[in-house]
Amino acid sequence: MKAVHFGAGNIGRGFVGLLLHQAGYELVFADVAEELISQLAAADSYDVHEVGDNPTVRTVDNFRALNSATQEADVVAEIATADVVTTAVGPHILKFVAPVIAKGIAARAAGLAPLQVMACENAINATDILRDEVAAQWDPAAGPLEAVAVFANTAVDRIVPNQEPGKGLDVTVETFYEWVIDRTPFGDNVPVIPGATFVDNLEPYIERKLFTVNTGHAAAAYFGFEAGLSKISEAMADQDVAADVRAVLDETKELLIHKHGFNREEQEAYVEKILGRFTNPHLPDTVNRVGRAPLRKLSRHERFIGPAAELAERGIVPEALLGAIAAALRFNDPADAEAAELAQIVASSTAAEATEKVTGLTPGHPLFAAVEALVEEVKAEVKA
């Protein structure tokens, strides 16, 4: 079995690549970072250090590495004979890897089983995004795309912080992970990935992860940044920050229980597990890293506005989520390009204009006025 994985960064090596290796796949990493690809190509193996209550070191070998920009033909050839293609590149980069994937699918010999494609990104239905981008590159004369490739959405969860300098290819990750995959597109030919969980209805798991892990993690970052703290574990050790994060997750918990029918005790236990992960002192994760890209995180269907809007539509005022949104609006990390752009939008627009532009909410939405009031507060603070 062979898997081609796009994105040889920390998540690619420390999560998706590791699980594919453990499943017995021959692994081909594809990336455009030349230094990283050169290091991988020259290495026989790398180690994944799982830190937490039961620390473990896992070694990954039997891999190759290719530069998908300068060695495109080689990547196409690998896809042409692969069983699985995965990505961990970021949702906005999927459109750039799609042309290579399309060429690889087109190069597959007749009679091969359909290529199994899964985007492992922090976005809802990321594989649908990738499928649409591949379809846009597909030549209809080659026949229907769905006859030669199967696209399945996934929900992925593992905290992989920025790595300390000088560690080379080794990656430090938390012990917890979750890779949930939609079983239905595969029919009787489900991929062999023992570390993954296959389900018939993925949406509840995607939203549970996004509205608990991603919402809570980012809330800890923004509240922690406001409190002048540097690490996520330090933020969660602060009683006020921890209480604010818990209040946010109490709101999303209620939404998830009522929307998807999760068992209350199981969902409460899930929240406790997630909060425990954020306090892991062995993960050197910073509020700046977790809080980066606030424009994306404040967008319409993301971790804050998404659940807050649904609660507002149900007649519930999401006070804690609004507090997190306010903290995100104040995230002014000078090293973050999106933070600078967010500040510029808030400063140069009316509160209503900024609310609509940043969040995608329309003025008639039941959440709009509350967010507009927060933007007005932030504008006043900047002027003061």
From Swiss-Prot:
Residues the record lists as binding NAD(+): 3-14
Molecular function GO labels: mannitol-1-phosphate 5-dehydrogenase activity
GO-annotated biological processes: mannitol catabolic process
A Pfam family per the record: Mannitol_dh_C
Keywords: NAD, Oxidoreductase
Family from the record: Belongs to the mannitol dehydrogenase family.
PANTHER family cross-referenced by the UniProt entry: ALTRONATE OXIDOREDUCTASE-RELATED, MANNITOL-1-PHOSPHATE 5-DEHYDROGENASE
Protein name, per record: Mannitol-1-phosphate 5-dehydrogenase
